[in-house]
Amino acid sequence: MNLRRILSYILSALLLTANAGGQDPLNLSSALEQALQNNYGLIISRADLQIAEINNNWGTAGRYPTIGFDVSDNNNYELNSSSYTNRLAAGVGLNWVLFDGFRVNVTKTKLENLKELTSGRLAVEVESTIEDIILVYYSVLLQKEQLKVLETVMNLSEDRYQYELKKQSLGGSVTYNVLQAQNVYLTDKANFLNQEMMVRNTIRNLNYMMGVEPAHTWDFTESFEADTTDYIMADLLSKMKSDNQSLKNQYTNLLLKENETSLQNSAYYPSISLGAGMDYGHSWGYSGGAQYLNNATLTPYGNVRLSFDIYSAGVRKRGVEIARINEEVAQVQIDQMEHALTNELFNLFDFHEVRLELLNVANENLGAAELNLSISEEKYRSGVINSFNYRDIQLIYLSVAYQRLQAVYNLIASKAALTRITGGFLGYASE
């Protein structure tokens, strides 16, 4: 390694240290906390929940009376008799539906279920956001680890290029070998630069999901390791059926369909309403400049009204029949979702088990590739293998290292998917 390389490494280390000092540390918990607070989709979903909570009110359901006030001033002028009349009228009235076939109670229950469904949809959004943040956070770590692998290969290629240049200066290497080594080094350097761009892009994606400015940089403190915990299928299936939020939402949707059936049935009952209030009127009249009318009235009133639809051309019957069909459809949708989720859970469990084994294979394979790379470097310098053999071994190491990193990421993704489908993320979000 020449002096220029040493100085370059020292300068790079100093720059990295300076940059790291200006970066905020970011572990996975902090990333999740920022996303749950700032994610745009969650902000919108929380606003929807606020609207549902406001609507969940007895006043919205129609339990309470309405009170209104009216005032008017009417003026008339008769041209033939040159008479003028004016009437001022004011009134305050109360209207109250005392009974409407239990519609008020059913409507209130429906509003509560709508709020519950909106809350459930927010929970699904939270689960999706948590899973996405986990995947993107570890995708950043994956890209950074791949960058380290590419840097290792690039440094080896640069060493080989410098080695060929030195041999050429001593008359021990031809131009062809130097150009071939230079081409390999520049290819590896281009791959390294492209990977640096991938790291920056992935960090920007993470910043967007957390609601942070794109240019913000972080010091990622989590280690790129996968949890190798084994799962029991029966336990996962039980948790999924009891805690999966999408399935819970489907049950709430069934309750809403039942509410709609009850509302349609309420049309078969009579309605009783109460009206009460007081009207005030004052009239004036003038003809030929003389007043001929000056009259004031104050009239309280109270009314009770009963109405009942005897025949409505089958509208009520059809409404109830359609509502009951929608109930049956909702039940079928529950069965369909439970079946689909069960299939998905079995697939995810199989993926997890296979990926555990693949990680073990990748770890063993990487150990062999690293040893082979170390041995081949000495063999290349001693002339036992040529540059093409050495390059093949470098590419094998690169491929194996990538496979091992991808195996770690795949196992992390499997665990995240299993946690989501069994409702495990909601416990974290509620803490």
Each model region followed by its residue ranges:
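Bacterial Sec-pathway N-terminal export signals of envelope proteins
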Residues: 21-68, 174, 214-258, 309, ...
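Small/polar, glycine/serine/threonine/aspartate-rich low-complexity segments that form flexible
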Residues: 23, 70-100, 107, 220-230, ...
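Acidic, low-complexity, intrinsically disordered peripheral segments
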Residues: 403-431
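Sec/SRP-type N-terminal targeting helices
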Residues: 43-47, 60-61, 98-126, 176, ...
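N-terminal signal peptide c-region/cleavage motif recognized by signal peptidases
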Residues: 15-19
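A short glycine-centered flexible hinge/capping loop motif at secondary-structure junctions
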Residues: 168-172, 380-384, 421
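Periplasmic alpha-helical coiled-coil/stalk elements that build and connect Gram-negative outer-membrane
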Residues: 128-241, 348-351, 355, 397
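Short flexible linkers and secondary-structure junctions
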Residues: 23-139, 175, 272, 276, ...
